[in-house]
């Protein structure tokens, strides 16, 4: 992907998000998240930064109000960290998001390539 196409992709992803949630390349978390959940989000963001990708955390989609753990704006992928959610809940969540979703278990090693 050339530089222009990459920027268009990033802009398209940003347009899906509420204006107040367009803080790129910033790790955000809530006090309700476990340490394992926060650490996994950090590992994902760290790898995305190494790759030179733009990302958003805790971003809210404008149309649905859904909140994503981490969005890779370069690849249009949502990373959702889970600990106790059941498979049916994860599948419903994946069907609701406007982008591809990859579920990552908290407490495990992040090994995307």
Predicted feature locations:
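Interdomain/boundary linker segments immediately adjacent to catalytic/signaling cores
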Residues: 1-46
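Solvent-exposed, charged interface segments at domain starts and junctions
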Residues: 1-6, 54, 72-74
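Generic structural motif recognizing short loop/turn segments at the entrances and edges of beta-strands
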Residues: 22-25, 51-57, 97-100
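Short beta->alpha junction loops/turns
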Residues: 33, 63, 83-84
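Catalytic cores of nucleic-acid endonucleases
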Residues: 39-46, 52, 75-113
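A short acidic/basic microdomain associated with nuclease active sites
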Residues: 45-64, 69
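Short acidic loop-to-beta-strand element that houses the catalytic metal-binding Asp/Glu
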Residues: 64-80
């Amino acid at each position: 992907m050339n530089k222009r196409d990459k920027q268009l992709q990033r802009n398209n992803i940003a347009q899906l998000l509420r204006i107040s949630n367009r803080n790129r390349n910033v790790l955000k978390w809530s006090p309700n998240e476990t340490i394992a959940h926060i650490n996994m989000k950090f590992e994902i963001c760290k790898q995305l930064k190494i790759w030179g990708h733009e990302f958003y955390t805790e971003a809210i989609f404008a149309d649905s109000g859904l909140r994503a753990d981490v969005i890779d704006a370069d690849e249009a992928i949502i990373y959702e960290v889970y600990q106790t959610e059941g498979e049916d809940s994860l599948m419903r969540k994946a069907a609701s998001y406007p982008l591809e979703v990859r579920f990552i278990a908290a407490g495990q090693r992040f090994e995307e390539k």
